[in-house]
Amino acid sequence: MEIRKLTINDYEEIIKLWSKARLPYKPKGRDSKEAIAAEMKANPEFFPGAFEDNRLVGMVIISCDMRRGWINRLAVDPDYRNRGIAKALIAESEKTLRKRGIRIFCALIEDYNAVSKKLFKECGYVEHRDTIYFSKRDSNEV
């Protein structure tokens, strides 16, 4: 497995991976090609992808608010799961964030997603049951 930075040329493969991994996709909002291209231009290192034989089999989007780093959109092709790809992408995310001086790493995980919760616990993350997530959106497309 090779981990390398994704580029906008990988966009179609990213969308296919999200679909195969059953991640929701907002093509008119945050996941549009234009939005992803802008983020990749601003922070190219925030888009690591895992490849097997030049095939995208895993990826993550990293973000930070200068205090905490966020692991977002972690996806692994179901045919390639249980091979350490997700853990490698988490480790790569932490390494990238440490280079920016970030020392707190976070992930938002849907309550029903037991597999992801188990994965992050195995990677040393602590579940905070006393925290409730709020959001406000300008539309359902974003």
Residue spans for each PLM region:
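A short beta-loop-alpha structural element at the N-terminal edge
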Residues: M1-I14
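Conserved GNAT-fold acetyl-CoA-binding loop/helix
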Residues: Y11, I15-A38
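A short helix-loop-beta-strand connector motif used in the catalytic cores of GNAT acetyltransferases and
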Residues: A38-G49, W70
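Conserved beta-strand in the GNAT
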Residues: G49, R55-S63, W70-A75
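A conserved beta-turn-beta hairpin within the catalytic core of GNAT-like acetyltransferases
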Residues: S63-N72, R81, E127-T131
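Conserved acetyl-CoA-binding loop-helix of GNAT-fold acetyltransferases
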Residues: V76, N82-K95, K118, E122
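Conserved GNAT acetyl-CoA-binding A-motif
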Residues: L97-I109
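Conserved catalytic-core motifs of GNAT/GCN5-like acyltransferases
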Residues: C106-E110, K117, K121, V126-S139
